[in-house]
Amino acid sequence: YETPNMEKLAQQGMMFTQAYASSISSPTRCSLMTGCNASRHRVTNWTLRKNTKTDAVSNTLEVPDWNYNGVAQVHGTNNTFIATSFVQLLKDNGYHTIHCGKAHWGAIDTPGESPYHFGFETNIAGHAAGGPATYLSERNYGYDEAGNSTLLFSVPGLEKYWGTGTFI
């Protein structure tokens, strides 16, 4: 594939020729948001519920005390890596910042669960869960008619699309 705009951007900036991505989404997403690798931010597994580890129990391994609440820009939540996001830096320098899709940087009920916390001015469907409850607008993306979440992975911010046939 030809990607002339991306190649031009790389020529003007910095191109990384050696990189690492975790096979689990949360650590890599946290790395992209903070610029730190997983060994530095210590988010080494997926995040979901506040103060809840997602590691399998092992009789053989001693699992380290990792940052299972994800990343945030403010102090106050234990087991959270604190950093300024690159999005906040862009916003502070006049860019309009939009997030669309999965977020999954912090556990539910922590600052890191919301893309707005990291400097995004617009958020379309981003939240703490690593995927949508449903892709179907006929099911209100996991909400009942009163707007109450019916599923853990209910997708926020898509109310105007409920019942429209819009598939995400």
Q: Can you say where each PLM-predicted feature lies in the sequence?
A:
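Formylglycine-dependent
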Residues: L48-H96, A103-I168
